[in-house]
Amino acid sequence: NSKFKHHVISTGNWRGMVMRTDLEPFKDARVRKAVRMAVDRQALADLVTGGAASVTCDHPVMKTDQYRADLSCPQDIEGAKKLLADAGYPDGIEFTVYPSSLEPTWTPIAEVVQQQVAAAGIKVNIQVVPSDGYWNDIWLKKPVAMTRWNQRPADQALNEIYHSSAKWNESLYKNSAFDSLLDMARKELDFEKRKSMYQAAQKVLWDESGTLIPYTVSKLIVTTARVNNLDEVENWSVRWHKVTVN
């Protein structure tokens, strides 16, 4: 309908699957990466969101953030098989993930992941659990759970989710060198140096993270065709002084 405009605005909100890095077989970073490498993120995003998403490579930094690293993460079944074999699992691995209706996309994500990673010898069992008590009984408790986060600035997201001292470090990821990188970035006054540190931290997560973050969600906004200059960056409120109406 020519009377309306359809705006697709990228956000930093994401849904994913988290593996506890303190438990076998996920203590080995190669196993964690194998699971994540075996996922076709674009296909997953298209199936679950109808394309209203932007692919991300397991780094919790929104597409429009000045510190976001430019990473590539195509599905690599053979690479995943090799990592599993190198880690001592030539016949693959098996685990159970626990989605809930608390988040409507969790079960579809789990089902798509289940189908995609099977080719790498990774068997995923799905046990849907009640939404009541999910955060107390499943999250931070089960070896593999579903998770969701709303957007945060790069510094907050990286520190709040992955620093070993963080209360909400849901994958229980611990890496002293990674912690030091984040600590130094917070102290660095030079923008380019600070940016380099945050991007290096995101590359570490691609290699070692226990969290599959396949995509960030896009916000869909419909306005009359007369509206122009609506922010392309998601904000908690519209900057009305920039908007024009013909």
PLM region descriptions:
Residues 1-8, 140-144, 155-169, 224-228:
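Ligand-binding "clamshell"
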Residues 29-33, 119-134, 159-225, 246:
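Extracytoplasmic/peripheral linker and loop segments enriched in polar/acidic and small residues
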Residues 221-246:
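Long beta-strand-rich cores associated with HINT superfamily self-processing modules
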